[in-house]
C-alpha cells in the first residue's frame, strides 16, 4: 500500500524537466542519511606528527641495533660450534696462517656478517610491531629525507676547521636537533663561502 502511494505521488509530482521531484528528494535524503550513518566525515585520519615520527624513528634504530647485536652473537656462536668440532693439525697452516689465527679471523668475519644482517631482521621486526602507523611513518620518512636532501651542504668545501654537519641526518632525533642541524648547515655554507 505504501509503495502504491509513492508511485501515485510520483506520477503527480513530475517536474518541468521530466524528472520526479520525489525521486530527487528521496535520493537527497538517502545520501544524507547514509553519510550520517557512517563515521567517515566525523573522524579524520590522524596524521602523524613530527615528534611521533622521531619517536618511531628512534624505536626503529633501537630495533636495528639490538638485532645487530643478537645476530652477531648468534653467528659467533654458530661459528664457534663449527670450529670447535673441526679436527685441526697444528703443524699445518690454513690459507698460509696459523690455525688459531685463521679460526679467530673466521669468527670475527662471522660476527661482522651477523652485525651487517642485523638491520634486516630489525627492520622486519619494526614493521611487524608498528602496525597501522607504518604507512604514515614511511610517508613522513620520505618527507624528512627530502628535507634533509634539500638542505644538506656540499661536502667538497670541508676542512678540519669546517667539518660537514651530519650529511645524512642520521643523528637527528627531535625537532630542536633538526633546527640545530639547519643552523650548522647554514654556518658551514657561510664559512665555506667566506674562506674560498
From Swiss-Prot:
It holds the Pfam family Pam17. It is found in: Mitochondrion inner membrane. Residues 1-33 form a transit peptide. The keyword Glycosyltransferase does not apply. One of its GO terms (biological process) is protein import into mitochondrial matrix. It is a multi-pass membrane protein. One of its GO terms (cellular component) is PAM complex, Tim23 associated import motor. Keywords: Membrane, Mitochondrion, Mitochondrion inner membrane, Protein transport, Transit peptide, Translocation, Transmembrane, Transmembrane helix, Transport. It comes from the Eukaryota. The chain crosses the membrane at residues 68-88, 106-126. Component of the PAM complex, at least composed of mtHsp70 (SSC1), MGE1, TIM44, PAM16, PAM17 and PAM18. Component of the PAM complex, a complex required for the translocation of transit peptide-containing proteins from the inner membrane into the mitochondrial matrix in an ATP-dependent manner. Belongs to the PAM17 family. This is Presequence translocated-associated motor subunit PAM17, mitochondrial. The lineage of its organism: Eukaryota, Fungi, Dikarya, Ascomycota, Saccharomycotina.
Amino acid at each position: 500500500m505504501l509503495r502504491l502511494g509513492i508511485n501515485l505521488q510520483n506520477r503527480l509530482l513530475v517536474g518541468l524537466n521530466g524528472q520526479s521531484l520525489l525521486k530527487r528528494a528521496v535520493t537527497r535524503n538517502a545520501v544524507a542519511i547514509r553519510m550520517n550513518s557512517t563515521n567517515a566525515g566525523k573522524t579524520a585520519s590522524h596524521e602523524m606528527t613530527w615528534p611521533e615520527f622521531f619517536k618511531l624513528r628512534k624505536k626503529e634504530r633501537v630495533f636495528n641495533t639490538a638485532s645487530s647485536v643478537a645476530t652477531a652473537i648468534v653467528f659467533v656462536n654458530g661459528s664457534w660450534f663449527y670450529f670447535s668440532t673441526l679436527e685441526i693439525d697444528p703443524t699445518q697452516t690454513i690459507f698460509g696462517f696459523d690455525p688459531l689465527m685463521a679460526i679467530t679471523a673466521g669468527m670475527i668475519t662471522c660476527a661482522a656478517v651477523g652485525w651487517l644482517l642485523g638491520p634486516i631482521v630489525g627492520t622486519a621486526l619494526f614493521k611487524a610491531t608498528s602496525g597501522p602507523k607504518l604507512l604514515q611513518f614511511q610517508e613522513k620518512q620520505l618527507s624528512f629525507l627530502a628535507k634533509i636532501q634539500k638542505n644538506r651542504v656540499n661536502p667538497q668545501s670541508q676542512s678540519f676547521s669546517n667539518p660537514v654537519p651530519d650529511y645524512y641526518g642520521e643523528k637527528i632525533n627531535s625537532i630542536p636537533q633538526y633546527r640545530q642541524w639547519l643552523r650548522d648547515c647554514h654556518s658551514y655554507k657561510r664559512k665555506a663561502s667566506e674562506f674560498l
